[in-house]
Amino acid sequence: MQEYNQPLRIGVGGPVGSGKTALLEVLCKAMRDTYQIAVVTNDIYTQEDAKILTRAEALDADRIIGVETGGCPHTAIREDASMNLAAVEELAIRHKNLDIVFVESGGDNLSATFSPELADLTIYVIDVAEGEKIPRKGGPGITHSDLLVINKIDLAPYVGASLEVMEADTARMRPVKPYVFTNLKKKVGLETIIEFIIDKGMLGR
């Protein structure tokens, strides 16, 4: 029987291109000196997101596992999370004192959710470039995630999106749940996400 700490598991979901991998890169770089971190990525046929994080030197390569889900990526984070659970366990055995494991889902739609067996907290990432109507479309990612990240606010003028409309719709869809507007390239909103993780994950500094 292997002895290891049970890390905080944070599911990161959102549509393709919304900024999930970019979020993980900046979170890892900002938090790795204070916390022991690892990442599991999900791609259908490749390990591309794992390679991106490795090339960006977000973490050492032995702290990142890429899961090739095949078929439907939603199943691997909900109905049959066994591959992801095994990857989390493998990382926890490799690094006995892990504080956090981020589990990035494959690109999914607004209906994808994480199994409670796999994620203790969930962060859902959407982006302004998808249009200002995205928050009001709802779906579990929008309404039920523990934190909603609305990314790429810098693109709003270029796509004709009103951040005021998006904020009003988001507040209506998530009346008691937190959300944050971000520009991850410039780290706008990053500190709010980190504080959320520390607070809700009950992590000491």
Swiss-Prot record:
Domain of life: Bacteria
Record's keyword terms, sorted: Chaperone, Cytoplasm, GTP-binding, Nickel insertion, Nucleotide-binding, Plasmid
A Pfam family reported for this protein in Swiss-Prot or TrEMBL: cobW
Binding site for GTP: G14, P15, V16, G17, S18, G19, K20, T21
GO CC entries: cytoplasm
Subunit structure: Homodimer. UreD, UreF and UreG form a complex that acts as a GTP-hydrolysis-dependent molecular chaperone, activating the urease apoprotein by helping to assemble the nickel containing metallocenter of UreC. The UreE protein probably delivers the nickel.
Protein name (Swiss-Prot/TrEMBL): Urease accessory protein UreG
Species for this entry: Escherichia coli
